[in-house]
């Protein structure tokens, strides 16, 4: 099954997440099919906090990809889909 979820990056105490499309059996930060955005929870006012590619999200959801709870919150916040 294909899922859309967050993959953690960044450094200690400075998380940065990529919104990725991946197989549900792969590891959190392992192989992925496509990167469709990012989420920076510690962004300041000069930096972008969330960016999502709505076209690609809609494509993968139409193909049957399941969206994780955390990504669903980001989508709702951005009103991307």
Curated annotation (Swiss-Prot):
One GO MF term: structural constituent of ribosome
Lineage: Bacteria, Pseudomonadati, Pseudomonadota, Betaproteobacteria, Neisseriales
Entries under HAMAP family matching the protein: Ribosomal_bS16
Name the record gives this protein: Small ribosomal subunit protein bS16
Organism domain of life: Bacteria
Gene Ontology cellular component list: cytoplasm; small ribosomal subunit
Keywords, ordered alphabetically: Ribonucleoprotein, Ribosomal protein
Protein's GO biological process: translation
Pfam families listed in its UniProt record: Ribosomal_S16
Family that this chain belongs to: Belongs to the bacterial ribosomal protein bS16 family.
Gene3D superfamilies xrefs: 3.30.1320.10
């Amino acid at each position: 099954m294909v899922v859309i979820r967050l993959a953690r990056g960044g450094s200690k105490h400075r998380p940065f997440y990529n919104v990725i499309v991946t197989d549900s059996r792969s590891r959190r930060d392992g192989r992925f099919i496509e990167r469709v955005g990012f989420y920076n929870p510690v962004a300041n006012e000069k930096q972008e906090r969330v960016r999502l590619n709505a076209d690609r999200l809609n494509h993968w959801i139409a193909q049957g990809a399941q969206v994780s709870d955390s990504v669903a919150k980001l989508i709702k916040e951005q009103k991307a889909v």
